Amino acid sequence: MPSIRLADLAEQLDAELHGDGDIVITGVASMQSATTGHITFMVNPKYREHLGLCQASAVVMTQDDLPFAKSAALVVKNPYLTYARMAQILDTTPQPAQNIAPSAVIDATATLGSNVSVGANAVIESGVQLGDNVVIGAGCFVGKNSKIGAGSRLWANVTIYHDIQIGENCLIQSSTVIGADGFGYANDRGNWVKIPQLGRVIIGDRVEIGACTTIDRGALDDTVIGNGVIIDNQCQIAHNVVIGDNTAVAGGVIMAGSLKIGRYCMIGGASVINGHMEICDKVTVTGMGMVMRPITEPGVYSSGIPLQPNKVWRKTAALVMNIDDMSKRLKAIERKVNQQD
């Protein structure tokens, strides 16, 4: 279990210490579950009333909240960002052994950097290049001529097809598949003819991809994921999609082929986005959005009907179904009124 003096933690976080710097911090916890040795954080002033009951040894907070502190405190401008950084310092995620498992199968032509870890039953095919400090989890497959940059980690059972490029310091969670064939077929009088997918997937640096996500290889050009992109679990990213730097994609999103998404976008969970179009930089699509047309202006976009009691929803649905007829009737009334005038 990691531990650190509160004063040392404050220094690493560039935080202002209030209280005993010799307190030993052994973990991060929520305000409700924290006990002695824990540090917690408060983002919203509405939680001030809970400080009296909080058992944490220290709390991260803003200057405005400091008068309400009942324990040692670290004062910062952005408590949530500080929480992320201190969680990294006190991370308890198991670290892999820096070795090659006896059951791993590694082709003689593969190139491995220093301190590479390859787990049990992993397969590394010919021409693969693994950078320094790369971690390949148990049961992973890395196909021919793929490259994985320094410091990147694949959790167990990740599949990387051939000719894929993954940048430095990337994290890919279990059961994700990178580089499977895109959904490309031509129709010959009712019969589907497969189109070989000859492109690649190019993933930038500092990209994180959740579990059970699929990113298809390009048909001719490449599927490209920019630097700093974060993608949640169970997303489908089709062939030739391009996602700009630092865009965030929440769980269950489906992106059709040849879609281009700009930088600094946020795509809400379970959204569906049409292909062969562009979304500009700094667009937010709220959850379950259905994007059928290009978006050319930054902003927040939504679609669909929010949850309602069933009886209310049925009435709303009926109105929507009849809106065309109502529009025609309204225009007819307007014409009559105009004629009378």
Swiss-Prot record:
InterPro entries in UniProt: Hexapep, Hexapep_transf_CS, LpxD, Trimer_LpxA-like_sf, UDP_GlcNAc_AcTrfase_non-rep
Enzyme class: transferase
GO cellular component: membrane
Tree of life domain: Bacteria
UniProt KW keywords: Acyltransferase, Antibiotic resistance, Lipid A biosynthesis, Lipid biosynthesis, Lipid metabolism, Repeat, Transferase
Active-site residues, record numbering mapped to chain: H239 (proton acceptor)
Subunit organization: Homotrimer.
Cited HAMAP family: LpxD
Protein name: UDP-3-O-(3-hydroxymyristoyl)glucosamine N-acyltransferase
Organism: Salmonella typhimurium (strain LT2 / SGSC1412 / ATCC 700720)
Taxonomic lineage: Bacteria, Pseudomonadati, Pseudomonadota, Gammaproteobacteria, Enterobacterales
